[in-house]
Amino acid sequence: MRRRTFITTSTAALMAAPAIAQSASQPEYTTTNAAWQAAYDKALSILVKNTQVMPRYSKPVLIEGSVYQGIWMECGPHEALVYRKFRPDVARNSHMCFFELQRADGQLPCNNKVTETGFGQIQMVVPIAATALELARATGDQELLETAYRGASMWDGWLLKYRNTRGTGLTEGFCTYDTGHDNSPRWQGIPPQCPNKDAKYYPEGFKLPRLCPDLSATTYGARKALSEMARALGKTSEADMWAERAATIRDLILKRLYVAEDAAFYDEDAGRQFIRIRSDILSRVCGEHVPDQALFDGLWTRQIHNPAAFWAPYPLPSIALDDPSFVRPITANTWGGPSQALTALRAPRWFGHYGRSAEFTVMMERWCEGLITDMTFRQQMNPLTAEFTRDGDEPDYSPAALVMMDYTWRLAGVVEEVDRLEWNIRPNHAASKGAQFRLPTDAKSTAEVRYSGRGADLTLGGKKLGRIEGLARLITDKSGAPTALLGVSEAPQKVTLRLTGRPARNVMIKANERISL
């Protein structure tokens, strides 16, 4: 019999909710803004279409869509996690398929496509250990927790054996597809795949292997997750071991692959030379929270929020705008410059962590603007014009559809995080025009936001939490108790709080300011 409820451990925070195999109800969003509603509804229809059964695994998973007929480890589990409120079974399957297809030596498949299960590259970005942990924690899925811990531990061992050939302790890249940076100048001249489709080997003559900051960051994020998993499973000594190993590789990334004078992370080739191209490596390293706040603040000023570099009109380009390697003109499926839907989908994993929720609002609005204007949901767009690449890139790409869905809720609805609910109140926004949001929570309650006039009414499980007028994010615990108000606009906002059981309160809140309640 499958056990789907966590055993009792000291990590009570992981025991938040019982498991659910199939969603009893799905999130609901309606608005009188016809254009926004049409884009949102089309995004959901694409995700339904892209929920398919692939060969060699018997249950439905969320595939990449467009020209990509399969599920990839670098992104598929994370995408399905974002989709979990609609299809928790698909979120689970999109993790378990990789563990079921894992080889006895620990190697995880890089993908499972219609044509084959791939082992020709490691292709990892968002750690499957991290997304599996989040899903297991949210749904109380003991079997997933145990399976993911075992599988991700074996994968770490495989990487240490076959992707640490230089003995540095950092994770090595052997080919272009290892990082999924197709057609990027970062990998110019390097074969796309490992010889004979075997990720244990690298081609000779290209100054390989490389020490890769982003692959190493993925390993770091996975080890942090493994530490939490071990603690939840009562394996205290193993939890400490994984935490120590995580700290070690983080330290190596910062000491060996960060160049302070450029405020950039670079690959180091086998000749110990940096590949000095400012690329999407940066967002991926931030995605696993490798930089501390002080280092991030420098990266933010010099690179990420610099309009000449990565803060394009439609962020974030895959190569800095002012980097001479930026590929022009833009071609299909290239990480040589365009803003990629995958990067946008991963952004919530780090913008808020580093205290940049207000600026993230701008990015979300720009992406939704581009998607609503285009309506074909393709892979990449010109960071200067929002024009989506058409020649060679097909429509109905799952990450683009997920961006539209996820950003709608993050802009003007309610979002459930690991330990809290975030109520994003944004009256007079295109997404909130006559809008209603209904979100089933992991505790089998329903969180609702209903807009009217200059604000919105908030309820949880039929109980009124209050009303907010003005633009801000109310943060509550899972039971709805208010804990903080966050400024999520770049301009100061006047906000009126009418919270149940408390006197009305007027506040002025600045960008990214956090007011305890």
Indicate where each model-derived feature is located:
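Alpha-helical scaffold segments in carbohydrate-active enzymes
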Residues: 42-49, 97, 151-165, 218, ...
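N-terminal export signals
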Residues: 5-23
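Structural helix-adjacent loops and short alpha-helical linkers that scaffold large soluble proteins
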Residues: 28-37, 83-95, 135-153, 167, ...
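Extended glycan-interaction surfaces of carbohydrate-active proteins
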Residues: 30-70, 93-118, 165-210, 251-339, ...
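Aromatic-rich carbohydrate-recognition surfaces in CAZymes
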Residues: 69-76, 80-95, 99-189, 212-216, ...
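C-terminal capping/lid segments that line or modulate ligand- or cofactor-binding pockets
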Residues: 71, 124-138, 261-303, 333-458
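Acidic/polar, glycine-enriched structural segments that form the non-catalytic walls/loops
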Residues: 20-69, 142-144, 153-160, 230-241, ...
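C-terminal beta-sandwich/jelly-roll accessory domains of carbohydrate-active enzymes
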Residues: 453-517
